[in-house]
């Protein structure tokens, strides 16, 4: 399926943003003695790049960043933080993205409640106040870059 140059550019911007955020979180994870998981080949996933966790309903969700206690390249740890990263050029689909983030993260957090995981979103670009308010009302810590 053909993709427009604008769509491809948006994907590149999103991937660059995610890589930059991962580098910002790396020293935090080290300081807290947490394993930082992100999209990369990991032996405990049989070399699969995708960070995927299962929610309380048995649904699998691909995630951006997970910090794990007692995790390593060869062993999955206990989740201590779930962080999603998103970029939007226009506000048109920002509410949908907020709903997608909360729909993935909240059922996972419920399943790992005993670990008291942090959950947040790093959002760049244009997001409506209602999209931001929804995430905040659901307990997300939100960092907004730009606007």
Where are the regions a protein language model picked out?
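Interdomain/boundary linker segments immediately adjacent to catalytic/signaling cores
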Residues: 1-42
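Active-site metal-binding core of divalent-cation-utilizing nuclease and nuclease-like domains
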Residues: 37-76
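Catalytic micro-motifs at enzyme active sites that drive phosphoryl/nucleotidyl and oxygen chemistry
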Residues: 51-56, 69-73, 108-110, 121-132
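Conserved catalytic cores of phosphodiester-cleaving nucleases, focusing on short active-site segments
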Residues: 65-67, 80-89, 101
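Active-site-adjacent loop/helix micro-motif of nuclease/hydrolase catalytic cores
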Residues: 75-77, 89-100, 130
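"Short basic amphipathic alpha-helical interaction patches in structured regions
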Residues: 80, 96-102, 134-138
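Short, basic/hydrophobic alpha-helical segments
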Residues: 102-113
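Domain-level recognition of nuclease-like catalytic cores that cleave nucleotide substrates
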Residues: 117-147
